[in-house]
Protein backbone atom coordinates (compact mmCIF):
# COMPACT_ATOMS: atom_id res chain seq x y z
CA UNK A 1 0.00 0.00 0.00
CA UNK A 2 1.51 3.29 -1.12
CA UNK A 3 1.70 6.11 1.41
CA UNK A 4 0.96 9.76 0.59
CA UNK A 5 1.27 12.69 2.98
CA UNK A 6 -0.99 15.65 2.13
CA UNK A 7 -0.03 19.08 3.43
CA UNK A 8 -2.71 21.68 2.60
CA UNK A 9 -1.93 25.37 3.02
CA UNK A 10 -2.71 26.84 6.44
CA UNK A 11 -2.51 30.45 5.20
CA UNK A 12 -5.77 31.98 6.38
CA UNK A 13 -4.44 35.49 5.76
CA UNK A 14 -4.25 34.83 2.02
CA UNK A 15 -7.74 36.01 1.17
CA UNK A 16 -9.43 35.20 -2.11
CA UNK A 17 -10.38 37.89 -4.64
CA UNK A 18 -13.97 36.66 -4.47
CA UNK A 19 -16.08 34.33 -2.38
CA UNK A 20 -15.25 35.65 1.12
CA UNK A 21 -12.81 32.80 1.74
CA UNK A 22 -9.09 32.16 1.96
CA UNK A 23 -6.32 29.84 0.85
CA UNK A 24 -6.37 27.66 3.96
CA UNK A 25 -10.10 27.03 3.80
CA UNK A 26 -10.16 26.13 0.11
CA UNK A 27 -6.97 24.07 0.17
CA UNK A 28 -8.23 22.20 3.21
CA UNK A 29 -11.28 21.17 1.22
CA UNK A 30 -9.15 20.19 -1.77
CA UNK A 31 -6.86 18.15 0.47
CA UNK A 32 -9.80 16.36 2.09
CA UNK A 33 -11.23 15.47 -1.33
CA UNK A 34 -7.83 14.25 -2.50
CA UNK A 35 -7.42 12.11 0.62
CA UNK A 36 -10.86 10.54 0.17
CA UNK A 37 -10.10 9.75 -3.46
CA UNK A 38 -6.70 8.23 -2.71
CA UNK A 39 -8.07 6.13 0.14
CA UNK A 40 -10.77 4.88 -2.20
CA UNK A 41 -7.99 3.89 -4.61
CA UNK A 42 -6.17 1.86 -1.95
CA UNK A 43 -3.60 4.38 -0.67
CA UNK A 44 -2.67 5.03 2.93
CA UNK A 45 -2.98 8.78 3.47
CA UNK A 46 -2.08 11.17 6.26
CA UNK A 47 -3.20 14.79 6.11
CA UNK A 48 -1.86 17.54 8.37
CA UNK A 49 -2.82 21.16 7.83
CA UNK A 50 -2.58 23.50 10.82
CA UNK A 51 0.91 22.72 12.06
CA UNK A 52 4.35 24.23 11.37
CA UNK A 53 6.14 23.01 8.26
CA UNK A 54 8.80 21.39 10.44
CA UNK A 55 6.10 19.33 12.14
CA UNK A 56 4.55 18.40 8.83
CA UNK A 57 7.86 17.16 7.45
CA UNK A 58 8.60 15.21 10.63
CA UNK A 59 5.20 13.55 10.52
CA UNK A 60 5.60 12.80 6.83
CA UNK A 61 8.89 11.07 7.55
CA UNK A 62 7.49 9.16 10.52
CA UNK A 63 4.55 8.04 8.38
CA UNK A 64 6.97 6.66 5.81
CA UNK A 65 5.46 8.71 3.02
CA UNK A 66 6.41 7.80 -0.53
CA UNK A 67 5.11 11.15 -1.78
CA UNK A 68 4.88 14.46 0.07
CA UNK A 69 2.08 16.59 -1.38
CA UNK A 70 1.66 20.25 -0.35
CA UNK A 71 -1.49 21.80 -1.83
CA UNK A 72 -1.68 25.59 -2.20
CA UNK A 73 -3.17 28.30 -4.37
CA UNK A 74 -1.14 31.17 -5.75
CA UNK A 75 -1.16 34.96 -6.08
CA UNK A 76 0.78 37.47 -8.14
CA UNK A 77 -0.67 40.49 -9.94
CA UNK A 78 -4.40 39.84 -10.12
CA UNK A 79 -4.13 38.88 -13.80
CA UNK A 80 -1.79 35.90 -14.15
CA UNK A 81 -3.37 32.49 -13.65
CA UNK A 82 -2.57 28.84 -14.24
CA UNK A 83 -1.25 25.74 -12.55
CA UNK A 84 2.28 25.75 -11.16
CA UNK A 85 3.89 22.67 -9.63
CA UNK A 86 7.29 22.69 -7.96
CA UNK A 87 9.73 19.93 -7.12
CA UNK A 88 13.34 19.48 -6.04
CA UNK A 89 14.82 19.15 -9.54
CA UNK A 90 13.61 18.69 -13.10
CA UNK A 91 14.51 15.02 -12.89
CA UNK A 92 14.01 12.22 -10.42
CA UNK A 93 10.92 11.04 -8.56
CA UNK A 94 9.71 14.46 -7.43
CA UNK A 95 9.62 15.63 -11.03
CA UNK A 96 7.88 12.44 -12.17
CA UNK A 97 5.17 12.94 -9.56
CA UNK A 98 4.84 16.64 -10.42
CA UNK A 99 4.54 15.82 -14.14
CA UNK A 100 1.90 13.14 -13.56
CA UNK A 101 -0.22 15.58 -11.54
CA UNK A 102 0.44 18.50 -13.89
CA UNK A 103 -0.68 16.50 -16.93
CA UNK A 104 -4.19 16.07 -15.52
CA UNK A 105 -4.55 19.22 -13.40
CA UNK A 106 -3.30 21.89 -15.82
CA UNK A 107 -5.94 21.11 -18.48
CA UNK A 108 -8.64 21.38 -15.79
CA UNK A 109 -7.76 24.77 -14.29
CA UNK A 110 -8.86 28.05 -15.93
CA UNK A 111 -5.43 29.66 -16.30
CA UNK A 112 -2.87 29.18 -19.06
CA UNK A 113 0.38 30.40 -17.44
CA UNK A 114 1.48 26.94 -16.36
CA UNK A 115 4.74 25.16 -15.66
CA UNK A 116 6.77 22.79 -13.53
CA UNK A 117 9.80 24.37 -11.89
CA UNK A 118 12.60 23.30 -9.56
CA UNK A 119 12.59 24.98 -6.14
CA UNK A 120 14.92 22.98 -3.90
CA UNK A 121 15.03 25.87 -1.41
CA UNK A 122 11.37 25.57 -0.36
CA UNK A 123 11.13 24.14 3.14
CA UNK A 124 8.86 21.17 2.51
CA UNK A 125 10.61 20.26 -0.72
CA UNK A 126 14.00 20.49 0.97
CA UNK A 127 13.22 18.79 4.27
CA UNK A 128 10.69 16.02 3.63
CA UNK A 129 12.38 12.67 3.00
CA UNK A 130 9.81 11.67 0.39
CA UNK A 131 9.81 13.07 -3.14
CA UNK A 132 7.71 16.22 -3.09
CA UNK A 133 5.25 17.58 -5.64
CA UNK A 134 4.31 21.06 -4.41
CA UNK A 135 1.02 21.98 -6.08
CA UNK A 136 -0.09 25.57 -6.66
CA UNK A 137 -3.49 24.84 -8.19
CA UNK A 138 -4.18 28.30 -9.69
CA UNK A 139 -4.16 31.98 -8.72
CA UNK A 140 -6.65 33.11 -6.09
CA UNK A 141 -6.06 36.84 -6.65
CA UNK A 142 -7.93 36.68 -9.98
CA UNK A 143 -11.65 37.04 -9.13
CA UNK A 144 -13.05 34.57 -11.66
CA UNK A 145 -10.35 32.02 -10.85
CA UNK A 146 -10.97 32.44 -7.12
CA UNK A 147 -14.65 31.72 -7.73
CA UNK A 148 -13.76 28.65 -9.79
CA UNK A 149 -11.39 27.33 -7.13
CA UNK A 150 -14.00 27.75 -4.41
CA UNK A 151 -16.69 25.99 -6.45
CA UNK A 152 -14.57 23.05 -7.60
CA UNK A 153 -12.63 21.78 -4.58
CA UNK A 154 -13.91 18.21 -4.92
CA UNK A 155 -13.09 18.00 -8.62
CA UNK A 156 -9.63 19.47 -8.01
CA UNK A 157 -8.92 16.99 -5.22
CA UNK A 158 -10.09 14.09 -7.37
CA UNK A 159 -7.94 15.29 -10.26
CA UNK A 160 -4.82 15.57 -8.12
CA UNK A 161 -5.53 12.03 -6.91
CA UNK A 162 -5.73 10.87 -10.53
CA UNK A 163 -2.25 12.25 -11.09
CA UNK A 164 -0.94 10.53 -7.97
CA UNK A 165 -2.43 7.24 -9.15
CA UNK A 166 -0.75 7.77 -12.51
CA UNK A 167 2.61 8.39 -10.84
CA UNK A 168 2.42 5.20 -8.79
CA UNK A 169 1.03 3.14 -11.67
CA UNK A 170 -2.18 2.42 -9.79
CA UNK A 171 -5.70 2.41 -11.20
CA UNK A 172 -7.83 5.42 -10.41
CA UNK A 173 -11.20 4.28 -9.06
CA UNK A 174 -13.95 6.86 -9.67
CA UNK A 175 -16.39 7.73 -6.95
CA UNK A 176 -19.63 5.76 -7.01
CA UNK A 177 -22.85 7.49 -6.09
CA UNK A 178 -24.11 6.54 -2.66
CA UNK A 179 -26.06 8.13 0.14
CA UNK A 180 -22.90 9.21 1.94
CA UNK A 181 -21.88 11.31 -1.08
CA UNK A 182 -24.82 13.66 -0.90
CA UNK A 183 -25.55 15.19 2.49
CA UNK A 184 -27.35 18.53 2.27
CA UNK A 185 -25.64 20.58 4.95
CA UNK A 186 -28.30 23.28 5.04
CA UNK A 187 -31.94 23.31 3.90
CA UNK A 188 -31.37 25.69 0.98
CA UNK A 189 -33.76 26.17 -1.95
CA UNK A 190 -31.11 24.73 -4.25
CA UNK A 191 -31.10 21.56 -2.16
CA UNK A 192 -34.90 21.43 -2.34
CA UNK A 193 -34.84 21.80 -6.11
CA UNK A 194 -32.29 18.99 -6.30
CA UNK A 195 -34.50 16.69 -4.23
CA UNK A 196 -37.57 17.58 -6.31
CA UNK A 197 -35.67 16.97 -9.54
CA UNK A 198 -34.44 13.59 -8.34
CA UNK A 199 -37.94 12.50 -7.28
CA UNK A 200 -39.33 13.59 -10.65
CA UNK A 201 -36.56 11.81 -12.59
CA UNK A 202 -37.16 8.58 -10.67
CA UNK A 203 -40.94 8.78 -11.08
CA UNK A 204 -40.74 9.42 -14.83
CA UNK A 205 -38.08 6.78 -15.41
CA UNK A 206 -35.43 9.21 -16.61
CA UNK A 207 -32.91 7.61 -14.26
CA UNK A 208 -32.74 3.94 -13.38
CA UNK A 209 -30.17 4.17 -10.61
CA UNK A 210 -26.51 3.20 -10.35
CA UNK A 211 -26.42 -0.40 -9.24
CA UNK A 212 -27.96 -1.38 -5.94
CA UNK A 213 -27.63 -0.48 -2.28
CA UNK A 214 -26.83 -3.08 0.36
CA UNK A 215 -30.55 -3.78 0.89
CA UNK A 216 -31.05 -4.56 -2.80
CA UNK A 217 -32.93 -1.37 -3.69
CA UNK A 218 -31.77 0.79 -6.62
CA UNK A 219 -29.11 3.39 -5.83
CA UNK A 220 -30.49 6.71 -7.08
CA UNK A 221 -27.75 8.90 -5.61
CA UNK A 222 -26.30 11.72 -7.68
CA UNK A 223 -22.77 11.15 -8.96
CA UNK A 224 -20.11 13.86 -8.98
CA UNK A 225 -19.74 13.59 -12.76
CA UNK A 226 -22.03 12.49 -15.60
CA UNK A 227 -20.56 10.91 -18.71
CA UNK A 228 -21.72 11.92 -22.17
CA UNK A 229 -23.25 8.47 -22.57
CA UNK A 230 -25.30 8.89 -19.39
CA UNK A 231 -26.42 12.39 -20.41
CA UNK A 232 -27.50 11.28 -23.90
CA UNK A 233 -29.34 8.28 -22.43
CA UNK A 234 -31.26 10.55 -20.05
CA UNK A 235 -32.09 13.01 -22.86
CA UNK A 236 -33.22 10.12 -25.08
CA UNK A 237 -35.55 8.84 -22.36
CA UNK A 238 -36.90 12.36 -21.92
CA UNK A 239 -37.55 12.74 -25.66
CA UNK A 240 -39.25 9.35 -25.82
CA UNK A 241 -41.44 10.34 -22.88
CA UNK A 242 -42.52 13.52 -24.65
CA UNK A 243 -43.38 11.53 -27.78
CA UNK A 244 -45.53 9.15 -25.75
CA UNK A 245 -47.35 12.08 -24.14
CA UNK A 246 -47.93 13.74 -27.52
CA UNK A 247 -49.29 10.47 -28.89
CA UNK A 248 -51.72 10.17 -25.98
CA UNK A 249 -52.93 13.75 -26.56
CA UNK A 250 -53.68 13.06 -30.23
CA UNK A 251 -55.75 9.97 -29.48
Located regions from the model:
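Active-site-proximal helix/loop segments of hydrolytic enzymes
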Residues: 2-5, 11-15, 21-179
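Short, solvent-exposed alpha-helical surface patches in non-cytosolic proteins
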Residues: 179-251
Amino acid sequence: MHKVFISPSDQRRNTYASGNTNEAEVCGRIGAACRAALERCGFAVELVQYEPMSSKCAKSDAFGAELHLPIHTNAFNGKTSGTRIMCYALSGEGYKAAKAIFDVLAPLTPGTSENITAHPELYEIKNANAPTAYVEVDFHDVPEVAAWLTANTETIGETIAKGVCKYFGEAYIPACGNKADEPIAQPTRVGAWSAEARAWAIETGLINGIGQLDDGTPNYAWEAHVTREQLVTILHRFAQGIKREESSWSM
